């Protein structure tokens, strides 16, 4: 059994290596056309889907203290695409043999609560999410104090959000450098959120 397991693991590693080669080739092709890899991603977090609810964190609670360097929060440190890794299960082909591929991403945080204090050394400290490049946060609450000792982008729900935050509540103390806000230090789309915060300058 051990020899079969070793063979299987070796085969899976070889497949992973080949996927990385293909990804590098596609990146090179994109660079030749002048297109950015980020242009190939579509955020579908705000769309209702009929399939299984993947890409979702729901009903999580934190009561412990969280300390870190960057992208620090009570529930999720970062909602972002890591371009160094291969996205899984979301490649959509157009046509029979197309290199015109698109990735769809979904990242949802729903009905989560943070009661623990959050301290980041640098940018992006939030009660629920530190850095939110994409996705949706809804029906979340934060009651823990949020601070950045040497950075900015501090918020009761998110340090910075380019996604959507809606129907969320905040009651806490906030402190840091630039860009401090009750819901988000920097926020793109904020809907029906409520705050009762004290901001230290």
Where on the chain are the PLM-derived regions?
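Surface-exposed loop/turn motifs in large extracellular/passenger domains
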Residues: 1-201
């Amino acid at each position: 059994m051990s020899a079969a397991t070793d063979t299987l693991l070796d085969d899976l590693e070889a497949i992973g290596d080949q996927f990385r080669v293909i990804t590098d080739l596609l990146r090179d092709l994109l660079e030749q056309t002048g297109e950015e890899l980020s242009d190939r991603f579509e955020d579908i977090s705000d769309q209702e889907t009929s399939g299984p609810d993947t890409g979702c964190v729901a009903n999580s609670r934190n009561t412990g203290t969280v300390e870190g360097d960057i992208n620090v929060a009570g529930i999720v440190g970062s909602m972002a695409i890591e371009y160094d890794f291969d996205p899984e299960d979301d490649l959509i082909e157009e046509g029979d043999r197309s290199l015109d591929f698109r990735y769809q991403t979904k990242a949802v945080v729903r009905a989560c609560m943070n009661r623990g204090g959050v301290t980041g050394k640098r940018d992006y400290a939030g009660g629920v999410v530190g850095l939110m490049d994409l996705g949706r946060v809804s029906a979340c609450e934060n009651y823990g104090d949020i601070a950045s000792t040497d950075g900015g982008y501090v918020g009761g729900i998110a340090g910075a959000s380019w996604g959507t935050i809606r129907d969320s509540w905040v009651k806490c103390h906030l402190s840091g450098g630039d860009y401090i806000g009750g819901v988000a230090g920097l926020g793109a789309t904020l809907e029906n959120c409520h705050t009762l915060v004290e901001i230290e300058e």
